[in-house]
A protein has these predicted regions:
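Nucleotide-activated chemistry modules centered on ATP-dependent adenylation/adenylyltransferase
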Residues: 12-14, 18-87, 103-395
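Short, glycine-rich nucleotide/cofactor-binding loops
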Residues: 87-96
Length: 395
């Protein structure tokens, strides 16, 4: 594992490996494993400054925020009064989407259709959590099962491409299946668990590239895939951002930003009321994501997504910096379980452990090495930031 405590950490910038003196933020724990991070004279990083300058003044998890989201909820009810469901919520079994379901039903009085995508990597824990939530609240569940042979082929292609963003096949399937379903069935409101409370520090793109960049997904699959993606759900970022929004009239709503949302309290409420089971860390409801984020990324690239996750919790007062430093110094999860996951992932992908190890040891690449729409995405991000619709740093 790359020891990032040393000065002279190697960081990747496109195809070039460059050296930069190691620095860690004095306020959160983001560091120069994000090669584009910057620090002010106090040693505070640009993520922290952006939080205090742009996010916090415009974030209202208070009476004002609740009043605003209740007005939106009334509009959702009016627009969906003649339908079986007035909105749709994609769920993974994780805390954000699970707590959102409770808020939507009980606080906002909505009638959501619960939408789940089974990409082949669900933990039993995540399946149980979804079932308990749906049964406990008396909601309808629609599950879309991805063709495993196509999913496996696409995931193998990303392994062979040697890029950090191995979760793109799963993430793309999740969002494409949801929005394609909404567009097909005339659903006008998609509620998401995206929030500032646990996600105000975004992972840099060199750690986790846009899963919605269909050009890149197709280019990697063209080079390394072996099976046609006949049924795999696909949706380009511009289809999602423009066509579905302005032609199909689909609106994305993020209610967690309008209420006080504290991760530990939310998990405890879910556990007490529904028998919901807690995870070791964010996104670990998927066995593949647990392995990819907790083992593969730190081992192969020196990227630890927990830095962004913990830094978000530090900024929102849910975790002390000292505790975050203690946590980040430890492996993401049990090392014996990591070894079991390594063997499980290899077997499920029809690889030997030696073949998976060879991929781990292969030359690292990035999204720059394959076709991408980053230029156009950047223009869109800049435009949204200019009109105040994009508050978080995305780079």
């Amino acid at each position: 594992l790359l020891d990032r405590r040393h000065v002279g950490l190697q960081v990747r910038q496109g195809n070039i490996m460059s050296k930069r003196p190691y620095m860690i933020c004095t306020s959160c724990i983001m560091d120069t494993s994000d090669s584009n991070i910057s620090f002010d004279q106090r040693g505070r990083c640009d993520y922290c400054n952006n939080y205090y300058d742009n996010i916090l003044p415009n974030w209202h998890p208070d009476e004002r925020g609740e009043r605003e989201i209740m007005e939106v909820a009334e509009q959702i009810k009016r627009d969906g009064k003649d339908r079986d469901h007035d909105c749709i919520i994609g769920v993974s079994g994780g805390v954000d989407s699970s707590y959102l379901v409770v808020l939507a039903k009980e606080k906002l009085g909505l009638r959501p259709l619960i939408f789940h995508v089974d990409a082949g990597w669900n933990s039993q824990q995540s399946v149980n959590n979804i079932e308990k939530l749906v049964d406990g609240l008396g909601l309808d569940l629609h599950t879309e099962v991805i063709n495993w042979l196509e999913m496996k082929d696409l995931q193998l292609a990303f392994f062979k491409a040697q890029v950090p963003h191995l979760d793109t096949p799963q993430d793309h399937a999740f969002f494409a299946a949801l929005y394609n379903f909404a567009a097909k069935h005339g659903v006008k409101y998609v509620l998401t668990g995206a929030n500032y409370s646990t996600e105000c520090v975004r992972e840099p793109l060199e750690w986790h590239y846009h899963a919605s960049d269909l050009l890149q997904l197709k280019d990697i699959h063209r080079q390394f895939g072996t099976r046609e993606l006949k049924t795999f759900p696909l949706a380009d970022i511009f289809t999602y951002k423009l066509y579905y929004r302005f032609v199909k009239g689909i609106r994305v709503v993020k209610p967690l930003n309008n209420f006080p949302y504290l991760k530990e309290e939310a998990m405890q409420e879910l556990a007490d009321r529904f028998g919901w089971q807690k995870y070791a860390h964010k996104h670990y409801e998927s066995r593949f994501t647990r392995f990819y984020e907790g083992y593969w990324l730190p081992k192969k690239f020196g990227f630890d997504k927990r830095r962004a996750h913990f830094s978000s919790l530090i900024l929102t007062g849910q975790l002390s910096r000292d505790e975050a430093l203690r946590k980040i110094a430890q492996p993401a999860y049990d090392e014996e379980m990591m070894a079991q996951d390594f063997e499980y992932i290899a077997t499920k992908l029809d690889l030997t452990t030696a073949e998976l190890q060879a991929l781990l040891d292969g030359p690292n690449k990035s999204y720059h090495d394959y076709k991408n729409r980053m230029g156009m995405i950047n223009l869109g991000t800049l435009a949204l930031r200019a009109v105040g619709l994009q508050k978080m740093i995305i780079r």
